Amino acid sequence: MSSLSQAASSVEKRTNARYWIVVMLFIVTSFNYGDRATLSIAGSEMAKDIGLDPVGMGYVFSAFSWAYVIGQIPGGWLLDRFGSKRVYFWSIFIWSMFTLLQGFVDIFSGFGIIVALFTLRFLVGLAEAPSFPGNSRIVAAWFPAQERGTAVSIFNSAQYFATVIFAPIMGWLTHEVGWSHVFFFMGGLGIVISFIWLKVIHEPNQHPGVNKKELEYIAAGGALINMDQQNTKVKVPFSVKWGQIKQLLGSRMMIGVYIGQYCINALTYFFITWFPVYLVQARGMSILKAGFVASVPAVCGFIGGVLGGIISDWLMRRTGSLNIARKTPIVMGMLLSMVMVFCNYVNVEWMIIGFMALAFFGKGIGALGWAVMADTAPKEISGLSGGLFNMFGNISGIVTPIAIGYIVGTTGSFNGALIYVGVHALIAVLSYLVLVGDIKRIELKPVAGQ
């Protein structure tokens, strides 16, 4: 029996538990972006009900990002302190609860509705803060470098998949039964997903479906398989954490990555806030039609997002260079996304949809910022590093909706808004080509008190 057992062991196939992990990240991120997009789909009807102008709408759109930015560093600290599984569960559960409660804001009247809506959107943003740093930590723990780009592109492409799936559903709900049901539907589904998360997600060393060969494979490729076991029981003084943060802020590479992510997110936030409104107000579509039309560029963004990761990992295997593997899709994708500006010069509906589809295909290919983070984050503060990255990136979520609101409110047109977003794509390209330099994992220097 012993010899048979040894023989069986020697031919044991490597498990692929990490694939189910990234599937779960994809599902959760889809709900994450679905919840963010609820207001953009229901927004036109809500604005009519409560008398909200474009500038006011811009501020309400930005409420999520104010909190999301504020919550990034605390969220990253919580992830490093208590681990991804527990913190992420509470994040999903709480943001879903606040999403559901937005369906009840019409119990208030007048300005009270606006205050309630802004407050609940703010709380959703605060609760979602650990989500993407959590995604990045989990990918860094589960995936070797040669698979990391694809893993990141899969969960990152969920933002487009969310629009493909949920925009038509939310548009139909708004049209047929009223905007409040959009929030009931998304909030309820999210609460269910939070409990599925607890059953599916485990650390690599504790996953019941992983074998030794898979652990050895991912560890050999640079996966940080002991990340949470090392961090959850260690208390680090604030002075040390601050010293580590200053090292990140002093890195030219990281400054370039932060600026690039800010600019890439300008495209993201245009898409999940103003794009459906653009289709309704600037192009005269019904809410129902806009919900379906918005899914076309989203499909292209999804395809581009997955393709960007595959291309990046293929380049990594062929060249062994993180610079070539990560920068090439980012630069080419952002250049392609600038075609959205051409929408200002055409009035044919299919051409507008086509240019937007190309733009979001390019944006999908170039959305590899989280792969760069998984490649560069110091192992001691991977959650905090991801939180800092996401904080800078999502300042764009505050600025972009408000800036577009002012542009549209002042000019009465979306033409300037599309130019504004296109210029950000160009700045992202320059940031990666000029500022970032060599992409490599940061090794922290000892800090006094450590």
UniProtKB/Swiss-Prot annotation:
Q: Which InterPro entries match?
A: MFS, MFS_dom, MFS_Na/Anion_cotransporter, MFS_trans_sf, Sugar_P_transporter
Note whether Hydrolase occurs among the keywords.
no
Superkingdom classification of source: Bacteria
Output the PROSITE patterns linked to this UniProt entry: MFS
* Sample GO molecular function, one term: transmembrane transporter activity
Compartments where located: Cell inner membrane
Cellular component GO terms held in the UniProt record: plasma membrane
Parts forming coiled coils = none
Topology relative to the membrane: Multi-pass membrane protein
What ranges are annotated Periplasmic (topological domains)? 42-58, 106-109, 175-176, 276-290, 351, 409-415
One GO BP on record is: D-glucarate metabolic process
Principal location listed in the UniProt entry: membrane
Which Pfam family name is an example for this entry? MFS_1
What is catalyzed by this enzyme? galactarate(in) + H(+)(in) = galactarate(out) + H(+)(out); D-glucarate(in) + H(+)(in) = D-glucarate(out) + H(+)(out); (R)-glycerate(in) + H(+)(in) = (R)-glycerate(out) + H(+)(out)
List all topological domains (Cytoplasmic): 1-20, 80-85, 133-153, 198-254, 312-329, 373-387, 437-450
* Transmembrane residue ranges: 21-41, 59-79, 86-105, 110-132, 154-174, 177-197, 255-275, 291-311, 330-350, 352-372, 388-408, 416-436
Q: Which UniProt keywords apply?
A: Cell inner membrane, Cell membrane, Membrane, Transmembrane, Transmembrane helix, Transport
What turns on expression? Induced in the presence of D-galactarate, D-glucarate or D-glycerate.
Q: Which CDD domains match?
A: MFS_ExuT_GudP_like
Function of this protein? Probably involved in the uptake of galactarate and/or D-glucarate. May also transport D-glycerate.
Q: Which family does it belong to?
A: Belongs to the major facilitator superfamily. Phthalate permease family.
Q: What is this protein called?
A: Probable galactarate/D-glucarate transporter GudP
Q: What is the lineage of its organism?
A: Bacteria, Pseudomonadati, Pseudomonadota, Gammaproteobacteria, Enterobacterales
